[in-house]
């Protein structure tokens, strides 16, 4: 019997949506979106993170001003309860996904350990 791994992945995607971690993240995100200033700050923070990450991937040096701007924005984000809650829920979901990744990659790990 042939296994269609993409069917399995699609099933996993559907089941992930039903986990406590994902549902809590969605509630936290929806709650944050109701606070216009928190949502705007969150979007700004995401944009800065993406820009800095892109520069690093391109091998470009970050300027002191860019690093300072990121730190200042992170400080502001850390003072908003809705965003702090969202980030906590993101960590929980990320832990679940890391656990799943370890399970999924077991065959590759076993291959290289022998």
From Swiss-Prot:
Disulfide bonds: none
Pfam families: Com_YlbF
InterPro entries: Com_YlbF, YheA/YmcA-like_dom_sf
UniProt-listed SUPFAM superfamilies: YheA/YmcA-like
Family named by the database record: Belongs to the UPF0342 family.
Protein name as it appears in the record: UPF0342 protein lp_1415
